[in-house]
Structure formats: C-alpha cells, structure tokens
Amino acid sequence: MFCYQCQETAGCTGCTRAGVCGKSARTAALQDLLVYVTRGLCQLTTALRNQGEAIIPEDDRLVTENLFVTITNANFDDDALQARIRATLERNAALRSRLDGAWLSAAARWDGSGDWDDKAQAVGVLSTADEDIRSLRELITYGLKGMAAYNHHVNAYGKSA
C-alpha cells in the first residue's frame, strides 16, 4: 500500500501499511487498479474519437465516476470497487474490439486476467521508479480526480460539464 492523497498522511510522507483515514491496503490496491483500467478506457475512447467514431455518454460518465470514487475517503467499499473494475474491463473489451489493438497501452489491453492483487502492485503509485515522472503522473491524476468530483456534482443536478 502507498497513499499520499490527503493531509492526514502519516508524517507527511504517505501511508504504507494502512491509511490514517482507515483505508486498508486492499482498498488502496483496488483504487490503484481502478485508476489503471480507467486509464485504459480513456485511451480506447480517445482512439475511437480520433477515428471519427462516436462514444456514448455512458463511457464519459464511467470515467468520471471511477475517478470520483477513488478520491480521498469517498469509497472504501471493496465490493463496489471490484464491480467498477469489472464493468470497466467489460467496456474496455467492447471498445477494444472496434480497434486494431497492436499499438494500445498495457492498460487498454489488460483483460482482467491474472491475480488482481499482483496486478495492482505492478501498476500502483510506486510502480513508477522515476520520482519525477511518478510525481508528475500523480499530480495530473489528482487534478483529474478533482475535475471528476466537480463533474459528478454537476451530473447530480442533471447537468453535464
């Protein structure tokens, strides 16, 4: 586990065994995995859009909701996180079938096979060895999560951003 998403992080360096907030290592791993499969979804929808193909609004909402549930203290329900990962993997498979996938990233190609705990470890925050790249990637991810939170609230009022 590694999480440094909130101001409560242990010693201002990140939580590594369990979150000060109560997040378990398992939940942190599932959140990392959900972000990973969502990254794949984004690559797939972008590729299809670049080919002039339409993407259904539900795909955009899936991205928003996936990112929203991974923000600080929003969702520690492992069953719900697993369901979201499965739903995203299913959607990724459907979108992938519309593309020549040879050039797709590992996130867009992953089909959910193998041990999810091992995969989460392999794609989690600390899987990026270069600290500068890791920090930049996380900064962008947290910015997107913040935008997703605002979009989630706009959608709650029946509007779209």
Summary of predicted features, one role per range:
Residues 1-161:
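Metallocofactor- and cofactor-centric catalytic cores in central/energy metabolism, strongly enriched
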